[in-house]
Amino acid sequence: MSSMQFGAATEFSNRCGVTLMNTPIGRVVAEVMGAKEGVELTEYPSMIRVDGVKLLSFDYDELTDALGQEFDGSIFEEISSTHYGRMVHLDDKTMLFASPEDAAEYIGFDLTAQ
């Protein structure tokens, strides 16, 4: 687990992340995400930060298997609080994008429109 740094930076970080409640469900979700390449976890007494490069994808089937009980968007909303990056909810997963342009196809935004 890494340490959190605070401050203001003007350059693009290419990172996105979410804060999860440090509960039994939140901990399992963090462990699944922490096993993925480019994902860092920072643990605090009441929360777990999940930070990644470019994209974080919380696949509900993968999380259901890890938990042994159904995981869906409503449970994601229940265990998460703050986030940074563009968040997109789909039926089978929640994704966070570091760049809004990368999320454009999921949110109906036409990058070529004048």
Curated annotation (Swiss-Prot):
Induction of the gene: By acetone. Transcriptionally activated by MimR.
A Pfam entry, by short name: MmoB_DmpM
Record-level Gene Ontology MF annotations: monooxygenase activity
Residue runs in coiled coils: none
Superkingdom: Bacteria
InterPro entries (alphabetical): MOase_MmoB_DmpM, mOase_MmoB_DmpM_sf
Family: Belongs to the TmoD/XamoD family.
Function: Effector component of the propane 2-monooxygenase multicomponent enzyme system which is involved in the degradation of propane via the O2-dependent hydroxylation of propane.
Assembly mode: The propane 2-monooxygenase multicomponent enzyme system is composed of an electron transfer component and a monooxygenase component interacting with the effector protein MimD. The electron transfer component is composed of a reductase (MimB), and the monooxygenase component is formed by a large subunit (MimA) and a small subunit (MimC).
UniProt name for this protein: Propane 2-monooxygenase, effector component
Organism: Mycolicibacterium goodii (Mycobacterium goodii)
GN (gene name): mimD
